[in-house]
């Protein structure tokens, strides 16, 4: 069996791990407002649950402020209610046709907890990478058409890919830590 076939599949799975990690990092509040903070919040809109970004335009007029302008003004109270129920730690300020969310700067203790969470996400990503690596090793070992030299080559290449991805994970976690600790 050709290593390139395995390599392509492994790289795709590694990319999925990186995407997952980036999505988890977006959820960590660094003190700056980002529309992604609202991604998991669903609004009861005429009997169906819909994400806020499908009901409103979300912008960042200031670094710590989100402005939510509903497409339908009648949904403004439903959106504010959903935000209150989401435990974001902000109170929506409802104007006539816009909702403003002002995020306070996180305290030192909160930032340290966020750094811990970022490290946990990084460790979870590394665990996922190890599982992918183990599955690939098992799959390749079961391939009876492969000669022993190819198996050793595959193992070396797989180890290199894994080390490369783990370095990338560590770099991303390090950048996120710096981002969180910046006041």
UniProtKB/Swiss-Prot annotation:
One of its GO terms (molecular function) is ribosomal large subunit binding. GO terms for biological process: translational termination. It is found in: Cytoplasm. Gene3D superfamilies: 3.30.1360.40, Ribosome-recycling factor. The keyword Cytoplasm applies. The keyword tRNA-binding does not apply. Its main location: cytoplasm. Transmembrane segments: none annotated. Pfam families: RRF. GO terms for cellular component: cytoplasm. SUPFAM superfamilies: Ribosome recycling factor, RRF. Keywords: Cytoplasm, Protein biosynthesis. It comes from the Bacteria. Belongs to the RRF family. Responsible for the release of ribosomes from messenger RNA at the termination of protein biosynthesis. May increase the efficiency of translation by recycling ribosomes from one round of translation to another. NCBIfam families: frr (TIGR00496). PANTHER family: MITOCHONDRIAL RIBOSOME RECYCLING FACTOR PSEUDO 1 (PTHR20982:SF3), RIBOSOME RECYCLING FACTOR (PTHR20982). This is Ribosome-recycling factor. The lineage of its organism: Bacteria, Bacillati, Mycoplasmatota, Mycoplasmoidales, Mycoplasmoidaceae.
């Amino acid at each position: 069996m050709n290593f390139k076939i395995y390599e392509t599949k492994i790289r795709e799975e590694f990319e999925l791990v990186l995407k997952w990690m980036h999505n988890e990092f977006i959820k960590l509040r660094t003190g700056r407002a980002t529309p992604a903070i609202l991604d998991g919040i669903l609004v009861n809109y005429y009997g169906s649950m819909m994400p806020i970004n499908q009901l409103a335009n979300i912008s960042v007029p200031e670094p710590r402020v989100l402005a939510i302008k509903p497409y339908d003004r009648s949904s403004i109270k439903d959106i504010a209610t959903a935000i209150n129920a989401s435990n974001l730690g902000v109170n929506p300020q409802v104007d006539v046709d816009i909702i403003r969310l002002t995020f306070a700067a996180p305290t030192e203790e909160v930032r340290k907890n966020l750094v811990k969470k970022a490290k946990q996400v990084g460790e979870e990503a590394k665990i996922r990478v190890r599982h992918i690596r183990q599955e690939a090793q098992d799959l390749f070992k079961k391939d009876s058409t492969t000669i022993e030299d190819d198996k050793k080559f595959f193992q070396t290449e797989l180890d290199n890919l894994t080390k490369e991805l783990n370095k990338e994970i560590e770099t991303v976690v390090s950048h996120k830590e710096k981002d969180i600790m910046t006041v």
